[in-house]
Regions:
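NAD(P)H dinucleotide-binding glycine-rich loop of Rossmann-like/cofactor-binding domains
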Residues: 78, 118-198
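N-terminal Rossmann-fold NAD(P) dinucleotide-binding loop
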Residues: 204-205
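Conserved beta-strand positions in the Rossmann-like core of class I SAM-dependent methyltransferases
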Residues: 96, 219, 279
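Adenosine-nucleotide cofactor-binding segment
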Residues: 191-200, 212-267
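Glycine-rich phosphate-binding loop and adjacent beta-alpha segment
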Residues: 262-329, 334-337
Length: 359
């Protein structure tokens, strides 16, 4: 059964915001206040379709019809650990209804959201524009994620998508794009810097594109020789395969590590210039790493992390991507039980070229 628009509004919004009648005809959260979601099965290898109830909107909330959702490697890890969880945090959707205090988006807008669900908005990090570091932040894993056809989200943590960027490309930018751009922006990387990118996957291929557009000399570093041509096509000036003897004379000011597995850390430490910085972006498969101590000491090297990005930086990222025509390479699958299973299998086996999007 499909409810009329007026019924949907009264069901999910305590005080519905009036919308233009012509606009209403283009909006469609079907069968609200229930919606369809795809929950992880045992081991994250399968998915189960389920019906959930949309919560009532708070004053800052928006009800969103989901258009598509990218699949991050982090999603596969959560799906494997938490049976029944609805994962997905690279979400693109269309605003259907909004709470009375929502001012930053309008009904009908295409928006992106997903990794950060909320923060306290009161601590030193929130007040200084670094809310991604808020100790009370909640993330996609604290509720229902984007493998669904609808969602309710705090409008203060959504982003308007530039019209130049298609939804299927915008999804991966909300996390993968934000993560690599956040490192470039947050660590004040100069356009004259030489930047190495470790790993040529979802984050890595975007890191190459963003760093090249940033003006940097870009060195792609991968264990897979077959990815050399792709890396050069994406904008790398040089390619290093770690399975071969390292013969390059190039030293790097920064290395962006997007890889999720164990790595030959001694190789990367020795590729850094004096005072160089290794920035870790991916969720590690192991809880700790071993860094060669003496080279790090005598060359004053830094090993740091970078966690996605603040709202301000995410908006900057979308502006930059639109201006420089930066788009992820995507494989598209239907957002169905079968499509979720196939898409997640591609990501888990690290075969995706280069980001899976469910729509």
């Amino acid at each position: 059964m499909t409810l009329a628009t007026e019924q949907v509004a009264s069901a999910i919004v305590d005080t519905p915001v009036a919308v233009d009648a012509a606009a209403v005809e283009t909006l469609s959260i079907d069968a609200a206040p229930t919606y369809t979601a795809f929950a992880a099965g045992p081991g994250g290898q399968s998915f189960i379709e389920k019906k959930l109830e949309l919560p009532k909107l708070g004053q800052f909330d928006v009800a969103v019809a989901i258009i598509c959702c990218g699949v991050c490697y982090t999603d596969t890890m959560y799906a494997a650990m938490a049976e029944g969880m609805v994962v997905g945090h690279e979400i693109i959707g269309r605003v259907e209804f909004k709470g009375e205090s929502v001012t930053n988006v309008d009904i009908g807008d295409t928006i992106g959201f997903g990794y950060i669900r909320s923060t306290c908005l009161e601590c030193q990090f929130c007040l200084s524009g670094k809310e991604n570091m808020c100790p009370k932040r909640t993330t996609f894993s604290d509720g229902v994620g984007g493998l669904a056809n609808a969602s309710v989200w705090d409008s203060r943590f959504v982003y308007k998508i530039p019209k130049e960027i298609e939804p299927r490309h915008a999804g991966p930018l909300t996390c993968a794009g934000a993560s690599v751009f956040g490192a470039l922006y947050g660590y004040n990387i100069s356009p004259t810097a030489t930047v190495g990118v470790v790993g040529l996957g979802g984050l890595g291929h975007l890191a190459i594109k963003f760093a090249r557009a940033w003006g940097c000399k870009v060195v792609a570093i991968s264990s897979t020789q077959e990815k050399e041509q792709d890396a050069l096509t994406f904008g790398a000036h040089e390619f290093i395969c770690t399975q071969n003897p390292i013969t390059t004379s190039t030293k790097m000011d920064y290395i962006l590590n997007t890889h999720v597995g164990d790595l030959p850390w001694d190789i990367f430490i020795n590729l850094l210039v004096t005072n160089g910085t290794l920035i870790n972006l991916g969720i590690a498969a192991k809880p700790s790493i071993e860094i060669p101590y003496m080279p790090a000491l005598f060359n004053q090297l830094k090993v740091v992390g970078s966690l996605v990005a603040s709202r301000h930086v995410v908006n900057k990222m979308f502006e930059f991507a639109a201006r420089h025509n930066i788009r992820p390479e995507v494989e598209e699958y239907a957002m169905t039980v079968k499509g979720c299973r196939e898409g997640f299998k591609r990501v888990t086996e690290q075969k995706a070229r280069y980001r899976v999007v469910l729509n």
